[in-house]
């Protein structure tokens, strides 16, 4: 009987060790992920090549902007499929105006050309011009990209640059390519003269 108690005690202790180890491992992973900080790298002046795009003109409250944009890119992909168009780059947003409450913008995806497209209401097919831009590469969480925009605004003020066109951002790598948000890449651009 004592042997059986010792065997049960050992079995329970082993279970305790296994469960404790798993909990410790999960805790370490969560702490490590919470330590990640998004990175913004100023790249200076670059040439953005431009090209044709199909997009939708939108005005969204700031507090639901990030969730709305995911839906709008899905809708744009459907329009591209329905019109048998070929994507020619990464999805992007052209910011036409911002207030404290709303963001007005064009959610867009590059395509080869704008011929023979059945455009639903509020959709546009246009050419985005080749232009000089100040660039910041944002790596990490999308909700942290405001620091990148601040870097661009400070550079414009410091160097007395003039905006030539609406600012825009390109989503190079996002949730569609990787669930690991620490690897997401977004290009932030201010067109300049």
Question: Across the structure, where does each feature detected by a protein language model lie?
Answer:
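A solvent-exposed interaction/effector surface
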Residues: 2-193
């Amino acid at each position: 009987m004592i042997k059986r108690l010792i065997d049960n005690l050992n079995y329970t202790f082993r279970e305790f060790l296994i469960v404790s180890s798993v909990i410790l491992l999960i805790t370490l992973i969560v702490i490590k992920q919470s330590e990640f900080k998004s990175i913004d790298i100023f790249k200076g002046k670059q040439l953005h090549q431009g090209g044709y795009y199909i997009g939708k003109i939108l005005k969204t409250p700031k507090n639901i902007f990030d969730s709305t944009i995911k839906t709008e890119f899905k809708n744009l992909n459907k329009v591209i499929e329905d019109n048998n168009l070929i994507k020619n780059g990464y999805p992007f947003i052209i910011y036409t105006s911002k207030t404290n409450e709303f963001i007005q913008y064009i959610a867009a995806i590059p395509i080869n050309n704008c011929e023979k497209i059945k455009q639903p209401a509020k959709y546009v097919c246009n050419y985005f011009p080749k232009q000089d831009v100040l660039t910041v590469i944002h790596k990490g969480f999308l909700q942290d990209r405001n620091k990148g925009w601040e870097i661009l605004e400070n550079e414009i003020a410091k160097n007395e640059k003039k905006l030539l066109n609406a600012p825009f951002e390109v989503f190079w790598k996002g949730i569609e390519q990787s669930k690991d948000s620490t690897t997401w890449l977004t290009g932030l651009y201010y067109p300049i003269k």
